[in-house]
Amino acid sequence: MAKFQGYLELDRFWKHDFLYPLIFREYIYAFAHDRGLNKSSLLENVGYDNKSSLLIVKRLITRMYQQNHLILVAHDSNQNNVFWSNKNLYSQLISEGFAVIVEIPFSIRLVSSLKGTEIVKYSNLRSIHSIFPFLEDKFPYLNSVSDVLIPYPIHLEILVQILRYWVKDASSLHLLRLFLHDYYNWNSLIISNKSISIFFKSNSRFFLFLYNSHVCEYESILLFIRNQSCHLRLTSSGSFFERIYFYEKIKHPIEEVFSNDFPAIPLFFQDPFMHYVRYQGKSILVSKDTPLLMNKWKYYLVHLWQCHFYVWSEPGRIHINQLSKHSLFFLGYLSSMRLNLSVVRSQMLENSFLMDNAMKKIDTLVPISPLIGSLAKMKFCNALGHPISKSTWADSSDLDIIDRFVRIWRNLFHYYSGSSKKKSLYRIKYILRVSCVKTLARKHKSTVRAFLKRLGSELLEEFFMEEEEVLSFIFPRTYYTLRRLYRGRIWYLDIFCINDFVNHE
């Protein structure tokens, strides 16, 4: 209960725009620690060594405000090296604490069972598999698709400027700006791509919030103009919490803000059949109109990024293709449009005739080559797809080794349940099964043939059981119906993030 009361106190601070005092609360870092242990975030925990105390945080903030980098260079370098050697720990402390503070309003719905607490329930966190039924319904009636890769901000100051629309606590913004600039001064005087990648990797949860704020601001403007042009509510699917902020902005008079920047919507942007779908940093624009209109949207997006967000983007980053001639790689699936040809016989009185009927249907295929590349990168096979033993797992128990391989296979099969051709997954199943046997044989210092001869080839059969067989045990009377469903596409709506082996980008 004390932990829940801490969450409620955070929520009260957020409502009154007082974020800066929360940075000096020690339980903030306890929350970050607990969340890292529970792995409630989509990202892996970067490590926590119980060194985050309130005293360290206060000393860090005080030194950030007082230090002069030009003077530090001239003073004793040995004393400064002690401080610089712990820069990763200090930056992680501040970033984790700040990430907890700004994410609490989104996690507060988890404690809605508390009495006397009025908490808004958000329903925007949808499964990413809900995107594909949308594509199945809309794609047959659309012509052009634009593959958009959202660019990253070239400077973190842009992200701080965007946060000013949400966070009105000037002290928090000042501390955030000082922290970001101070981190770069630790690396070098010139901001390089390497230092940015190091910062993003060591502070992934904190960067996720900053990047989502950038995407939210970009989508707010884009969707506002799109809705102004067609006066229809846009169907957009995603799994991250920045969409909540967008719908919160709708409740406020954002028209007054955007109308000043965009006083008139050009006529050539009026497209009632424009659809926008995004996951992480990749999005697609699909339209029924000609490629000319898509090109106008393309150059509009480039100017929006360059002029409003000061982000350099080339038109070549946005690709426009015809759905009938192009395969779209999105969320690990290779989607394409194909025609189902059928012949219908019609008879009227004494006359009969045949009619050719062509229906568009979307195909969702499994990209086997990128999957094998991911397995090779994780040392389950070589570059040609030949299974090898997982040497790093040879020290585990037999059941643990089998459980790890089975979990990977079932997660992949579960994720690609919407594929129209599941037989292509049998090669992935073969690689994982043989790699599992080779790992067990390596552990027992035996050959694969001798190991299988001693224990039997049926050792792994029950562990790699097909979902079709599992469903037949649960529903034996409807086995043939389930078999037809198995051969078709099944979109499981409990998938909220892309599989690690599927994310090849």
Curated annotation (Swiss-Prot):
A cellular component annotation (GO) from this entry: chloroplast
GO MF entry, a single one: RNA binding
Keywords from the UniProt entry: Chloroplast, mRNA processing, Plastid, RNA-binding, tRNA processing
Keyword Chloroplast: yes
Coiled-coil positions: none
GO biological process: mRNA processing; RNA splicing; tRNA processing
A UniProt-annotated Pfam family: MatK_N
Top-level taxon: Eukaryota
Compartment(s) of residence: Plastid, Chloroplast
PANTHER family: MATURASE K
Family of the protein in this entry: Belongs to the intron maturase 2 family. MatK subfamily.
Biological role stated in the UniProt entry: Usually encoded in the trnK tRNA gene intron. Probably assists in splicing its own and other chloroplast group II introns.
Protein name: Maturase K
Name of the gene encoding the protein in the UniProt record: matK
